[in-house]
Curated annotation (Swiss-Prot):
Main localization, broad class: cytoplasm
Pfam families to which the protein is assigned, alphabetical: Peptidase_C12, UCH_C
GO MF: chromatin binding; cysteine-type deubiquitinase activity
Biased composition annotated in UniProt, kind: Acidic residues: 385-394
Catalytic activity, EC: 3.4.19.12
Compositionally biased region (Polar residues): 273-282, 450-496
Site for Important for enzyme activity, residues: 184
Domain of life: Eukaryota
Cysteine disulfide links: none
Sequence segments annotated as region (Disordered): 272-347, 363-425, 440-496, 543-580, 659-685
Name of protein: Ubiquitin carboxyl-terminal hydrolase BAP1
Keywords: Chromatin regulator, Cytoplasm, Hydrolase, Nucleus, Protease, Thiol protease, Ubl conjugation pathway
Residues with site note (Transition state stabilizer): 85
UniProt source species: Xenopus laevis
Length: 685
């Protein structure tokens, strides 16, 4: 029982893989580098490594030293999972079990659930024997340890093997029933550090206790000693980012539906035009003379969809009219009622939505492009009614080479611009629904999208290890309200839309757009934590859960375009808007940009977590691999080539020149610095 347990290193990747081998799901281990910074997010417990003062850490005898903070009540001690360490080198597993088996809401798996149920009410000594009699724990423990040497070196005279080895020990800090406990398997009783204040978290008190302990051990110099290490047991961040991505994608679909509904409300005359063009498309597609130009134009549009938005904007308007004329048969049809997908060989989108994909992430767009899914382009029929914004849109489309600073704002005599149609976002919504139904997949080997945020830590995939990546506690995510920062690359979809609709890209990319944009200010904090709801009347509202479990929406309505109200400098927190408040298209586009920025940031964080798991496994394989066979084969090859003897002789001669004795270590004789009595001189000259 007490033989065969190996020492484990203090590495967060090792402990994360050990937790998975125990059968626990949804838990990982992170390393803490700064004790003065607050730990974001929930923390199940801390694992603290320090240098053990006694001669042997893995001794059978448990320390009997007691102090005022020791909890000696059997009822309290037996109701928590506190086990004596009766097995050498098992302190890492003891510390990890002390955290996992004392916190609720964790999927322990069959092995730990059976141990927790079996040892309920046992004494600490009995729980220690239960850990030693669990072969699953011993197997998982030793699978992540370095292999021990087969032949131990001979004991050298005059040197104590115990005193020369530095022993380290793991302990746990866990919150139990409102009090902070320190669980040390080499002590008889757990240590109670008391409750924490009402205005702080338990992690704040634990950090203070650990800092005081480090300060006492290092004579007041806590940051000049590397004999300590602190790790935190936290929820799995992969599950966190996956859930956040699902919520963001559903909210993106809701915003797109709000835009589509806004088009139907503001321009109802286009509904009849859409129906008439749909009827013409069914008749024209029957003739084979029209099918060939349509297929050629679709093929040409598919190859042209790979170009950037700058190239599309710089293309003259006359070039769009070359080739076969596509009148009305290549318009996108509205979304069918049964949820099916209507095949559109040459889908038509308006100018401000052309060649963009709302419903897919950058990595999924690459997959679609590789599969041959393309977008066709064409010129829509002009709408009879125009306003100032539509004239700006027409000017941007027909004069793409004009610099943004010299664009005309006044209304001029221009041809009627193409107006948005009711089926503008139908195809985008269908693709969004397919995206929501498909399982979430992140390609870790794919190149990073231009508008996705890279990892702040530079890394080389071939050489960096997981321990060099850093901790997630030191790199907090941006809040939704900060996603409009110009340092973050904007989405090509919303930037092109804002450039076409409003004449310039700057308003939606400036930092102060958060002040005057009501949609981002009021719905921005909810896009990654809650689901947005769109009613039939056009009210866009976040769903807030009440104590009864019901969901109540806070209504904000998307209505016809109008200027946003003046910013309120004193309004720093999200408040409930009055009933019937309306959002303009500019505000909805800004909200859409905020959602897309959060999706890009979450995908980058999820990709980074997956890369960390890969490097954890690489480090573990390097650590546990047995290199003895390779070394023996290499030495035998040197002996066969006749090079071994010369190398050994050369190495010995180098050591002799450096003054290092080859044989038995001799105790160096120190010079005698004692004061010697001088002979008394009787006579003085």
């Amino acid at each position: 029982m007490n033989k065969g347990w190996l020492e484990l290193e203090s590495d967060p990747g090792l402990f994360t893989l050990l937790v998975e081998d125990f059968g626990v799901k949804g838990v990982q281990v992170e390393e803490i580098y700064d004790l003065q910074s607050k730990c974001p997010g929930p923390v199940y417990g801390f694992i603290f490594l320090f240098k053990w003062i006694e001669e042997r850490r893995s001794r059978r005898k448990v320390s009997t030293l007691l102090d005022d903070t020791s909890v000696m009540e059997d009822e309290v001690v037996n109701n928590m999972f506190f086990a004596h360490q009766l097995i050498p080198n098992s302190c890492a597993t003891h510390a990890l079990l002390s955290v996992l088996l004392n916190c609720g809401g964790v999927h322990l798996g069959p092995t730990l659930s059976r141990i927790k149920e079996f040892t309920k009410g046992f004494s600490p000594e009995s729980k220690g024997y239960a850990i030693g009699n669990a072969p699953e724990l011993a197997k998982a423990h030793n699978s992540h340890a370095r292999p021990e040497p087969r032949h131990l070196p001979e004991k050298q005279n005059g040197i104590s093997a115990v005193r020369t080895m530095e022993a380290f020990h793991f302990v746990s800090y866990v919150p139990i029933k409102g009090r902070l406990f320190e669980l040390d398997g080499l002590k008889v009783y757990p240590i109670d550090h008391g409750p924490w204040a009402e205005d702080e978290e338990w992690t704040d008190k634990a950090r203070r206790v650990i800092m005081e302990r480090i300060g006492l051990a290092t004579a007041g110099e806590p940051y000049h000693d590397i004999r300590f290490n602190l790790m935190a047991v936290v929820p799995d961040r992969r599950l966190k980012y996956e859930g956040k991505l699902n919520i963001l994608k559903m909210n993106r679909q809701t915003v797109l539906e709000a835009l589509q509904q806004l088009i139907r409300v503001t321009q109802p005359e286009l509904i009849q035009a859409q129906k008439s063009t749909d009827g013409q498309s069914t008749e024209e597609t029957k003739s084979p003379a029209i099918k060939a130009p349509v297929s050629q134009e679709s093929h040409r549009a598919h190859h042209g969809s790979h170009r950037s938005t700058t190239d599309l904007g710089a293309e003259p308007a006359g070039s769009l009219l070359r080739g076969p004329v596509l009148s009305a048969h290549n318009k996108s049809k509205p979304l069918p009622q049964n949820g099916g997908i209507v095949p559109a060989p040459a889908s038509r989108l308006p100018a401000f939505l052309d060649n963009h994909n709302y419903a897919k992430s950058p990595m999924q767009e690459e997959e679609d492009l590789a599969a041959g899914v393309g977008r066709s382009r064409g010129v829509p029929p002009p709408a009879p009614d125009t306003d100032e914004e539509e004239e700006e849109e027409t000017e941007n489309v027909r004069r793409p080479l004009t610099p943004p600073g010299f664009k005309r704002r006044s209304s001029e005599s221009l041809p009627p611009p193409p107006g948005p149609e009711p089926g503008v976002l139908a195809e985008k919504l269908k693709e969004t629904q397919r995206d929501l139904c498909s399982p979430l997949s992140i390609k870790t080997g794919a190149p990073t999208a231009p508008h996705s945020q890279p990892s702040p830590t530079p890394s080389n995939e071939s050489t960096d290890t997981a321990s060099e990546i850093g901790s997630a506690f030191n790199s907090p995510l941006r809040s939704p309200l900060r996603s409009a920062n110009p340092t973050r690359p904007s989405s090509p979809v919303t930037s092109h839309l804002s450039k076409v609709l409003f004449g310039e890209e700057e308003p939606l990319s400036r930092l102060d757009c958060v002040r005057y944009n009501r949609a981002v200010r009021e719905l921005g904090p909810h896009i990654s934590t809650g689901i947005l709801h769109l009613s039939k009347d056009g009210y866009l509202s976040p769903l807030s859960r009440l104590d009864t479990g019901k969901v109540s929406p806070k209504s904000h309505k998307a209505e016809e375009p109008r200027e946003s109200p003046e910013p309120d400098s004193e309004r720093n927190r999200v408040t409930e808007a009055p009933q019937g408040e309306k959002f303009s298209p500019k505000e909805l586009l800004a909200l859409l940009k905020c959602v897309e920025a959060e999706i890009s940031a979450s995908e980058a964080c999820l990709r980074e977590e997956l890369e960390k798991r890969k490097k954890f496994k690489i480090d573990d394989q390097r650590r546990t691999h047995n290199y003895d066979e390779f070394i023996c084969a290499f030495i035998s090859m040197l002996a066969q080539e006749g090079m071994l003897a010369s190398l050994v002789e050369q190495n010995i001669s180098v050591r002799r020149r450096q003054g290092v004795s080859i044989g038995r270590l001799h105790k160096q004789r120190k010079p005698d610095r004692r004061k010697r009595s001088r002979p008394y001189k009787a006579k003085r000259q």
